[in-house]
Amino acid sequence: KVCVVTGGGSGMGLAAAKLMPKDRIIVVSGRTESKLKKAVAQLKAAGFEAYAKSCDTSKRESVTALAEYAASLGEIINVIHAAGVSPAMKVTMEDLLRINALGTVYVNQEFSKRMHKGSVIVDIASMSAYSVPDLMVPKKAYALAETDEALFIKKALRMTAFIKDAYMKNGFAYAISKNFVTWYAAKSAYEYGPKGIRVASLSPGLIATDMGNLESEHGGEMLAFSCEGRMGTPEELGFAIA
């Protein structure tokens, strides 16, 4: 039985992988090979059979190659889609939509073709998914992600024209990308349910991962209103995912 973790080279993805049953074959994927090698070494030291496979989730062909590789190792039973980017990573608004939103489409579609009854996909969203007022969420554009990617991105980012601050523009695009993840996970759950495949999304707050630490300056504003008053740990999220 195979468990695939996108964005599994570090952070909550790797933490979740370490908490999977020891009989799982773990495949960690990402774009930084040095991180993947370290992750595989840690997983093997913990007693797992583990492999690394580079993957750019913003490209369908790369996701397809990952799915095919995982299927060649055994029955894919778990997919944890933790790969993503945030505004502090110096990416464009379009990058945020392509990697976070369209990447989720590619992962769910390509892996579901190779999964069977009893398997599970967990798409990692964000608390930011719920930070945008409903009137500003372009849900009517979401279905375009499967039929016209360019138009989907154009319509999803339409409201950013009214935002002047560059970081706030990217923050809005990020929130929309993660709101899309929650929507698409629900859509996938409905579509794949008859095959016995479960799909769920998880929306973390600010987590002390490499990506989360980049957001800590702006995220401090959110922490001031949180009940814990601190960032979450990758291990806490890994437990919730696994």
Predicted regions and their residues:
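Conserved glycine-rich cofactor-binding loop
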Residues: 7-11
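Conserved glycine-rich Rossmann-like NAD(P)H-binding loop of the short-chain dehydrogenase/reductase
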Residues: 23-38
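Rossmann-fold cofactor-recognition segment
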Residues: 43-61
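Hydrophobic structural elements of the Rossmann-like NAD(P)H-binding subdomain
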Residues: 80, 122, 199-202, 212
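Catalytic loop of short-chain dehydrogenase/reductase
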Residues: 86-89, 120-194, 206
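C-terminal helical subdomain
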Residues: 106, 174, 179, 201, ...
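Short, flexible catalytic-loop segment of classical short-chain dehydrogenase/reductase
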Residues: 130, 203-214
